[in-house]
Design a protein with these regions (language model features):
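N-terminal "arm"/small-domain region of PLP-dependent enzymes with the aminotransferase-like
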Residues: 2-61, 67-70
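A broad structural signal for alpha-helix termini and local helix breaks/kinks
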Residues: 30, 75, 124-125
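Conserved PLP-enzyme active-site core in the AAT-like
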Residues: 7-11, 21, 80-191
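Conserved N-terminal alpha-helix of the aminotransferase class I/II PLP-enzyme fold
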Residues: 42-91, 95-96, 112-120
């Protein structure tokens, strides 16, 4: 199946219109105006080792590609990845780190995120986490091995709002990756 081209909807200023049309192109295989749901686990191959862009839905699927393209446009990003759950996405991001790396995280996080960091990754991956109020002078917690700042805004459960511009500016100054979980805000409210 041919890869879809990125739509030109980034030129549209109205978010409501973008949210309806982002990532949507007619299906190149069938001509369907809306993307079909490909509920298959495997894709036929002409010959062994020669696929048509898809082998298994667990690695890629045309339906998921459209979802990811839509999310990237809504977030004004270059690429998006869809996961089965938020914690699966968080795990993939944290797994970018190496043993001995340090993360500064907001002190008010979703409980599942806190447990993933404090009870699983700190022990299984030897990653050091410092939980602080990122709206204060968190830069005093930056260490030589700090590789990531983890922000949640609005936070869960207290709905604290983080100053993303300030956090990002400090992180860039120290060449630290900033990750922001905006589950509560969505692209509608967090631009």
């Amino acid at each position: 199946m041919a890869k879809r081209k990125k739509s030109d909807l980034r030129k549209i200023n109205q978010f409501d219109t973008l949210s309806v049309h982002a990532g949507i192109k007619s299906d190149p295989l069938t001509g369907a105006v809306m993307t079909p749901i490909y509920a298959t686990s495997t894709f036929a191959q002409d010959t062994p080792g020669k696929d048509k862009g898809y082998e298994y839905s667990r690695s890629q699927n045309p339906t998921r590609e459209v979802l990811e393209a839509s999310l990237a446009e809504l977030e004004n990003g270059h690429k998006a990845f869809a996961f089965a759950s938020g914690v699966a996405a968080q795990t993939a991001v944290i797994d970018l780190l190496k043993p001995g790396d340090h993360v500064i995280a907001f002190d008010d996080l979703y409980g599942g995120t806190f447990r993933l960091f404090n009870e699983i990754k700190a022990k299984s991956s030897n990653i050091d986490f410092t939980f602080v109020d990122l709206n204060t002078n968190f830069s005093k917690h930056i260490q030589k091995n700090t590789k990531m700042i983890w922000v949640e805004t609005p936070t869960n459960p207290l709905l604290k709002i983080a100053d993303l511009k300030r956090i990002s500016r400090i992180a860039k100054k120290h060449k630290i990756l900033t990750v922001c979980d905006t589950t509560f805000a969505t692209p509608i409210n967090q631009r």
